[in-house]
Amino acid sequence: TDVFIAMELMGTCAEKLKKRIQGPIPERILGKMTVAIVKALFYLKEKHGVIHRDVKPSNILLDERGQVKLCDFGISGRLVDSKAKTRSAGCAAYMAPERIDPPDPTKPDYDIRADVWSLGISLVELATGQFPYQNCKTDFEVLTKVLQEDPPLLPPAMGFSGDFQAFVRDCLTKDHRKRPKYNKLLEHNFIKRYETLEVDVATWFKDVMARTESPRTGGGLSHHHLPFFTR
């Protein structure tokens, strides 16, 4: 007996889109993407008690209708008392400080705010067109910078709105206890603005796909997409 699985076809992921453009993705597009991703993560947490644990540009999908979706739940996990208790894989480049170096080594738990950090790193990368730790050659260098240096921010000189800069700054609050959860993010001015603002993501997406070439796939993955195992 044959078994057929019908799956929705999406156009591409934000990672490949960035490579196609070879530069920043406009704030208005990222605004709509951010609204969709925060709502998706909030839904996972509230309705299913699940933390994604691998938020990054390659797991954010877009299509010609302008729809944005979150994918790859291979390492997502159940929350127990709102905490992740299980060991999981993830990408070092997008990993929150509290996952790298738990405040209490005897209780290396973390919550959905770890995904908020990952979202912040992803937004910096997509908004600037450059991975914030691109000069690092190893995962260890990335982890060291995450722990020892100030979080990356959106460069004011690139003309980002104050709301966008503030949103990313909130997501990349180093102390996870002060980092907002999804309910607070949904109240942020940046989210409120792009919930209602009319943005033609579909036309922008189709234009980009029509005038750019598909990025070549090499034999290996960039260093910040290598799996890194931790709690």
Residue ranges and their predicted role:
Residues 45-62:
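Catalytic-loop of the protein kinase fold
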Residues 181-216:
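Regulatory extensions flanking the kinase catalytic core
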